[in-house]
Amino acid sequence: MAKFLKAGKVAVVVRGRYAGKKVVIVKPHDEGSKSHPFGHALVAGIERYPSKVTKKHGAKKVAKRTKIKPFIKVVNYNHLLPTRYTLDVEAFKSVVSTETFEQPSQREEAKKVVKKAFEERHQAGKNQWFFSKLRF
């Protein structure tokens, strides 16, 4: 079978706490691992999407409304719905790894790096579809 779930592919989580949230695959594990003996992927996604901003909003309001709350997680392939979109993950690829999930402090640091990368891309106006809430 062709490996189409590559790093950088955007997907939608269809099961669990983050169902309906958009994620980007950081590291795919097709064969599984000792701790997760099934095909899975390390993903970084958006838990809370940025709100809409208009011209009449002040600088404080704009700053507050453009905040993004990210999450990082190990997700089974069965719970991912891949899309045609891709996103550059080079900014945080080195930070999010299997070792990141061992200690909460490492996890928080990784989330901060992911948040910074996502907010920079959102401010630049790139990947607009990824930063909009999925309506269903």
Swiss-Prot record:
Biological processes annotated in GO: cytoplasmic translation
UniProt subcellular location: Cytoplasm
One example GO MF annotation: structural constituent of ribosome
UniProt cross-references to InterPro entries, sorted A to Z: Ribosomal_eL27 (IPR001141), Ribosomal_eL27_CS (IPR018262), Ribosomal_eL27_KOW (IPR041991), Ribosomal_eL27_sf (IPR038655), Translation_prot_SH3-like_sf (IPR008991)
Pfam families associated with the record: Ribosomal_L27e (PF01777)
Gene Ontology annotations for the cellular component aspect, listed alphabetically: cytosol; cytosolic large ribosomal subunit; preribosome, large subunit precursor
Coiled coil (residue ranges): none
Keywords annotated in UniProt: Cytoplasm, Ribonucleoprotein, Ribosomal protein
The protein's assembly and partners: Component of the large ribosomal subunit (LSU). Mature yeast ribosomes consist of a small (40S) and a large (60S) subunit. The 40S small subunit contains 1 molecule of ribosomal RNA (18S rRNA) and 33 different proteins (encoded by 57 genes). The large 60S subunit contains 3 rRNA molecules (25S, 5.8S and 5S rRNA) and 46 different proteins (encoded by 81 genes).
Reported function: Component of the ribosome, a large ribonucleoprotein complex responsible for the synthesis of proteins in the cell. The small ribosomal subunit (SSU) binds messenger RNAs (mRNAs) and translates the encoded message by selecting cognate aminoacyl-transfer RNA (tRNA) molecules. The large subunit (LSU) contains the ribosomal catalytic site termed the peptidyl transferase center (PTC), which catalyzes the formation of peptide bonds, thereby polymerizing the amino acids delivered by tRNAs into a polypeptide chain.
Miscellaneous remark of the record: Present with 22900 molecules/cell in log phase SD medium. There are 2 genes for eL27 in yeast.
Family statement drawn from the similarity comment of this UniProt entry: Belongs to the eukaryotic ribosomal protein eL27 family.
Name the record gives this protein: Large ribosomal subunit protein eL27B
Organism: Saccharomyces cerevisiae (strain ATCC 204508 / S288c)
Organism placement in taxonomy: Eukaryota, Fungi, Dikarya, Ascomycota, Saccharomycotina
